[in-house]
Amino acid sequence: MKHQRSTTVLGLTLAAALAVAACGSDDEPAADEPADTEASADTEAPAETEAPADTEAPADTEAPADTEAPADTEAPADTEAPADTEPTDGGEAVSLAGLCPDTVGIQLDWMPEAEHGFVYQLVGDGYEIDAGNAYVTGPLVDSNGNETGVDIQIRSGGAAQGFSPVTTLLYQNDPEDVLLGYVYTDEAIQFSGDFPTIAIESGFEKNPQMIMWDPETYPDVTGIADLGTEGVTIRYFGGAAYMDYFTGSGILSSDQVDGSYSGDPSLFIADEGTAAQQGFGSAEPYLYENELEGWLKPVAYEYINDLGWENYAESIATRPENIETYSECFAGLVPLIQQASIDYLEDPAETNEVILDAVDQFGADFGWDYTPGTAEYGIETIKADGLVANGPDDIVGNFDMDRVNGLIELAVPIYEAQGASPMEGVTAEDIVTNEFIDPSIGL
């Protein structure tokens, strides 16, 4: 499932590349045919929320072509795995030297933004930016700023990778170059047959993807189901599995959904809000209210997760064979990622400076404009709407296996109808694991 988002490109409209592939369909193109991806998760959030604008939107994708997929690998059972540590002056620090690659490569699904803050939180002082490739590389540090003995390289996605889906990039690169990537749960289900991945940390408990509408035009609408009752046209990236779920379950009707959305905000503005549209709750509301000339007023929205498509978003995933090969690495690294999620929520200022520095150095080259106001809105919304949160327990970053199995039950028939080939009999244990989660870390 391709999770794409809408953006302003240097002010208002999308660059041609973004208009073609960015923002929100659920179908990822073949490896030969680049596509943009981005993504979702679960937690309770208000049915309607008024807010400013800039968002992302997911989308389904076809399995990448011309890439060799490894044999099916059984996901490890959920267990607790302590990390080796060594004391330093700044406190007890994890040493990843000799356990992880010298540089831990993480492939993102989009350009730098607040939704990626928890991995940028791991970048220490003295980082370097490769503007041509849109990479940020620096020492991988713990919560106290202690270096762990390895570097981290964060690779931007979207236009920087020719809009290739993260799943494709994980198979096109050696693990020593790209060990991890952002893979949404529904995407993992879609590609589980031919290009399997296993997520080792959940990222976002709740998917930021939403449907938004103009509350002035539709004052009686409080959620997506009301849009269905009113017969409002809803634009989305064609092929999105969640939309097939909405139409198949009767929440929306097939004659009111329009799969022509390309990420360009101009249509929403031009039709004066008579149509609804997909987006990211942590972005578009701010963009539309504060930055898009011609609109500059609030939109209302409801998260897709709240209607039963309980997708985890921005999950940190790897190829299945890496679970055993890099088990000691993950045992030390995953708790650092968990803690980084908490640290970023509590004090995002320094990490946002890294994100904005990256945008300043290479954003324009890839048609990406991201402002300090959008970053601040993003982190505020991530906290307020519970997009990053503990699971049903007191642990951050772990997976609810029943929830994942519930999404599998919904998603497999949809993907098969779309022509994808999910793993026969796929279960939660095939695509996610809590093996490396530290149960003592939570919000």
State what each model feature region is:
Residues 2-10:
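Bacterial N-terminal signal peptides that target proteins for export
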Residues 17-22:
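C-terminal motif of bacterial Sec signal peptides marking the signal peptidase cleavage site
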Residues 24-33:
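Bacterial lipoprotein signal-peptidase II cleavage site
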Residues 46-103, 131:
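N-terminal low-complexity, Pro/Thr/Ser-rich intrinsically disordered segments
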Residues 90, 401-443:
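Conserved C-terminal helix/tail region of periplasmic/extracytoplasmic solute-binding proteins
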Residues 91-261, 268, 275:
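Short, glycine-/small- and polar/acidic-enriched structural segments
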Residues 186-187, 261-364:
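Pocket-lining segment of extracytoplasmic ligand-binding domains
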Residues 326-418:
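Secondary-structure end/capping motifs
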